[in-house]
Amino acid sequence: MTVPEEAQTLIGKHYRAPDHFLVGREKIREFAVAVKDDHPTHYSEPDAAAAGYPALVAPLTFLAIAGRRVQLEIFTKFNIPINIARVFHRDQKFRFHRPILANDKLYFDTYLDSVIESHGTVLAEIRSEVTDAEGKPVVTSVVTMLGEAAHHEADADATVAAIASI
């Protein structure tokens, strides 16, 4: 396993998403329905208040909505040597500092913690520190992405062209 040459200067880089993500009440409800989470604090303000929250509470995996956008920006911004069309999540960890609530403005500070290439496959670890409008921590997310090395596709195209010319 090695760090790809084009990624060596990227390790430790920081990216701040240019805008915040506003958590909407209806988005929380829609997401809860989509993931079949029927907890009443996702749907009813009175139930959320009875549980001690000032607004609807987002399901635990709600961060995936905004996080996916930030991840795609990271691959473009850092020019990670990975074929983005052939990438999947290998692992994801969340550390919740507090629940995500309706009307939260979430800000993403994202770091490329590691990039490793082995046998035409790239493993990239991306960490996002998510904060609210006051700069207080909400969630820390660490995602490990696994994908085909970007240059691998070029080799594949050359191989296909060579075979086609026979």
Swiss-Prot record:
Q: Name one GO molecular function term.
A: (3R)-hydroxyacyl-[acyl-carrier-protein] dehydratase activity
Write down the CDD domains for this protein, in alphabetical order: R_hydratase_like
Q: Which UniProt keywords apply?
A: Acetylation
Residues bearing N-acetylthreonine are T2
Keyword set includes Metal-binding:
no
- InterPro entries found in the cross-reference section: FAS1-like_DH_region (IPR039569), HadA-like (IPR016709), HotDog_dom_sf (IPR029069), UPF0336/Enoyl-CoA_hydratase (IPR050965)
The record, for Pfam families, names:
FAS1_DH_region
Q: GO CC terms for this protein?
A: peptidoglycan-based cell wall; plasma membrane
Q: List the signal peptide residues.
A: none
One BP annotation, GO: fatty acid biosynthetic process
Is NAD tagged as a keyword? no
Q: Where is the MaoC-like domain?
A: 8-131
Q: Which family does it belong to?
A: Belongs to the UPF0336 family.
The protein here is known as UPF0336 protein Rv0504c
